[in-house]
């Protein structure tokens, strides 16, 4: 079992880091008391093989040995990896000023700057055990997310799930579409008697559409658009991208385009799905 423990000073980005890990398929628990960690792992081990927890300063043992003892109580099948997030004091003060949130140690009537310094002292129990220390002082939310993914997955690029979906405008635009392309201006096989009962998956329709230069150009332009902006979308903390291509009824032109372009991208991207909405009815 993979067990990720996320901790660090308040305001350093623990919540962002936990959301990233959750998007990677981990079962996540926020702000769990450390002494409950072994029990949690045992109770969910039958259903989950990837767990992540966040720990803040209020849920820590008082000394290093106590923390080590708790980790020793973990079952042998759990392999913990500890991420420690931190920022410099001035950055943390600025972030708290911007969000107007109360620091967890301010309940002791400590001024913010002293609460931040005291928190650092209390968290020393974790720093010495950290497998990865991430300084978020100069990182944006997206950069922190990318750093977490890179460390966990062992590679920089997140594998986006790309769906190419055909549809008919007369049945409505797909609600989950990120980009919509209108193919209704292209030559329509519907008006060819021998092609009318077929779909864009049938070879005669493919041959008919591929023979028109305007179809070839439109196909190329959609491919180029997606290929150009895909790296930026992958870095933007996305999990899914849906490219919807529509024609009048969702039978010929849009089906041909979604299938052709989807197959092209599937040759170089591992997570490509092709869906023909109207053909599923």
Swiss-Prot record:
This is Nucleotide-binding protein PSHAa2554. Keywords: ATP-binding, GTP-binding, Nucleotide-binding. The lineage of its organism: Bacteria, Pseudomonadati, Pseudomonadota, Gammaproteobacteria, Alteromonadales. GO terms for molecular function: ATP binding; GTP binding. Displays ATPase and GTPase activities. GTP binds at residues 56-59. ATP binds at residues 8-15. InterPro entries: P-loop_NTPase (IPR027417), RapZ-like (IPR005337), RapZ-like_N (IPR053930), RapZ_C (IPR053931). Belongs to the RapZ-like family. Pfam families: PapZ_C (PF22740), RapZ-like_N (PF03668).
């Amino acid at each position: 079992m993979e067990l990720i423990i996320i901790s660090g000073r308040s305001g350093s980005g623990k919540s962002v880091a936990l959301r990233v890990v959750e998007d990677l398929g981990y079962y996540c628990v926020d702000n769990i008391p450390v002494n409950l960690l072994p029990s949690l792992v045992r109770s969910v081990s039958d259903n989950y093989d990837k767990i992540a927890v966040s720990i803040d300063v209020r849920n820590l043992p008082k000394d290093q040995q106590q923390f080590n003892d708790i980790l020793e109580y973990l079952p042998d099948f759990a392999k913990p990896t500890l991420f420690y997030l931190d920022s410099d004091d001035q950055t943390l003060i600025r972030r708290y000023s911007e969000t107007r949130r109360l620091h967890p140690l301010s309940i002791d009537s400590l001024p913010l700057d002293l609460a931040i310094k005291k928190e650092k002292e209390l968290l020393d129990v974790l720093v010495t055990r950290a497998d990865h220390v991430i300084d978020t002082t100069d990182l944006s939310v997206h950069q922190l997310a990318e750093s977490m993914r890179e460390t966990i997955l062992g590679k920089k690029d997140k594998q986006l799930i790309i769906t190419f979906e055909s549809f008919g405008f007369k049945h409505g635009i797909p609600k989950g579409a990120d980009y919509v392309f209108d193919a209704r201006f292209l030559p329509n096989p519907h008006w060819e008697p021998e092609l009318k009962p077929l779909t864009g998956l049938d070879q005669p329709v493919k041959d008919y559409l591929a023979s028109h230069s305007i179809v070839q150009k439109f196909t190329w332009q959609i491919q180029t658009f997606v290929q150009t902006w895909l790296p930026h979308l992958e870095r933007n903390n996305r999990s899914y991208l849906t490219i919807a291509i529509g024609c009048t009824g969702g039978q010929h032109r849009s089906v041909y385009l979604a299938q052709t372009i989807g197959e092209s991208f599937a040759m170089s991207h591992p997570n490509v799905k092709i869906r023909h909405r109207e053909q599923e009815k």
